[in-house]
Structures are given as C-alpha cells and as structure tokens.
C-alpha cells in the first residue's frame, strides 16, 4: 500500500534484472517495476523481484518471497507502476488496464491488487494520498483490507465487496476504499475510472478536487511461502 522511494534505477533494458534490495527499481517509460519492501522490518524473510520484460508496451515480471512473523502486517508491495500526467480525477476520461498473473502457492496470507492514490495537491508525495483506491483481484488466507465492508457493488460487470477505512500516512489521514473480488481473477481487462465513478456517485468521492497521482499493480504478502507471484503482462494508461 506504500510506494517506494526509488533508491536504485536500472537501465530501460532491464530484461533479466534481479532486484533484492529494499527499494530497487527498473524503468522503461512509462512503466517501472519496483521491489518496494516497505514493511520488511515487521517480520523475517526475503524477497527478490525478477524483470522478465520491460518496455514502453508493458511490464512482465515475477517475485519470489518468504515471510514469517508480524502476523497481519504487510511486508512489501512489489509492483509494476505507470508514469503519467497528473490530472483531476473528474478530468480523466478512462483508465484502461489489462493484466494476466498467477500465484504458485495459494496457501499463504497475501493479496493481489491495484493501488492508486489521489490528492488535492498535484505535487503530493506519491507514496500516499488523501484517498487510496485498491482493487483486490485476489486474497489468500484470512487477510482483509483496512476498515470494514460497507457495501457490495457491481463494477465493470463483476461483483465486488466494498471496504472503507482510514489510516495515518505522513501525519495526515488517508481514506482507503477497497474493492475485493469474491474469487481470484487471474486475467482482467477493465477501466479503473468505473471504480472512481462508483465512489463519486455512491460514496461522495470528490473527483473534481482530487488529482490522480499514483497507479500500480502488484502483490502484498503478509506471511507464508516460499511463493512465486508472476505477472505475465501488465498494461495501463490514463486518458
């Protein structure tokens, strides 16, 4: 749920790159692959990210992880991210995305999710926001989003649990809405703007004053493993 502060930036020709340090990152605009072990000190274990293909047309990568201890805490959010021009959510016409992924060990505590941040200030740090939108394509074990379930909604032709909760990030309150699939969705193409439209119409999300500042897709491991999470291909754009 937290975005890495990039400490290492590898060349765009990062195919085959292995990243094991806390905030390693590889980039080929507009895409990046990020290690992001932001919660590693809350448990014991290891994790590395392997870039399979990274270009201007998409990202393919996998991560191998094993974590124990710190039950109920996220250890990392290894992800692929998109660089885009920040704009008000109300001015975004569409956010098309497509992903195919797999998880070899499902006897773990983890989720597979999109993570987006918005903020009134377009220059807000991209590691948090006034609002966070998460789309859980899978959850394994007993993990739950922050807060509690407040509704069930059909968005993009699929049924989702809708959760809401708050947390303190960088000294300020962050409001998090999570849409959770009832069973794993290993291949998905959709428009994330549909989720913002739902929140605007049903939960009072202030789309006309919030800028979209971050868009990522990855996995949050809590405990378990060894496990391998593989992204065969991920694409996204903000229009």
UniProtKB/Swiss-Prot annotation:
Residues 1-16 form the signal peptide. GO terms for biological process: cellulose catabolic process. Its EC number is 3.2.1.4. Disulfide bonds: none annotated. It holds the Pfam family Glyco_hydro_12. One of its GO terms (molecular function) is cellulase activity. Keywords: Carbohydrate metabolism, Cellulose degradation, Glycosidase, Hydrolase, Polysaccharide degradation, Signal. SUPFAM superfamilies: Concanavalin A-like lectins/glucanases (SSF49899). The keyword Oxidoreductase does not apply. It is an enzyme of class 3 (hydrolase). Has carboxylmethylcellulase activity. Belongs to the glycosyl hydrolase 12 (cellulase H) family. This is Endoglucanase A.
């Amino acid at each position: 749920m937290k975005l890495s502060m990039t400490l290492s930036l590898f060349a765009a020709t990062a195919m085959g790159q292995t990243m094991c340090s806390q905030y390693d990152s590889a980039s080929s605009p507009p895409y990046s692959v990020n290690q992001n072990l932001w919660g590693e000190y809350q448990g014991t274990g290891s994790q590395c990210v392997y870039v399979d293909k990274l270009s201007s047309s998409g990202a393919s990568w996998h991560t191998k992880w094993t974590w124990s201890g710190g039950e109920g805490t996220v250890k990392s959010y290894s992800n692929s991210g998109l660089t885009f021009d920040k704009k008000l959510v109300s001015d975004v016409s569409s956010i098309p995305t497509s992903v195919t992924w797999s998880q070899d060990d499902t006897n773990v505590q983890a989720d597979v999710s999109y993570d987006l941040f918005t903020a009134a200030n377009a220059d807000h740090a991209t590691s948090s926001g006034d609002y966070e939108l998460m789309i859980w394509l899978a959850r394994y074990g007993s993990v739950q989003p922050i807060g509690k379930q407040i509704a069930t909604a059909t968005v993009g032709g699929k049924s989702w649990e809708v959760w809401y909760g708050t947390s303190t990030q960088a000294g300020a309150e962050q409001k998090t809405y999570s849409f959770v699939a009832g069973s794993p969705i290993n291949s998905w193409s959709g428009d994330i703007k549909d989720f913002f439209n739902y929140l605007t119409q049903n939960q009072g999300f202030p789309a006309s004053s919030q800028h979209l500042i971050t868009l990522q897709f990855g996995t949050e491991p809590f405990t378990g493993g060894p496990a391998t999470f593989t992204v065969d291909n991920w694409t996204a754009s903000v229009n």
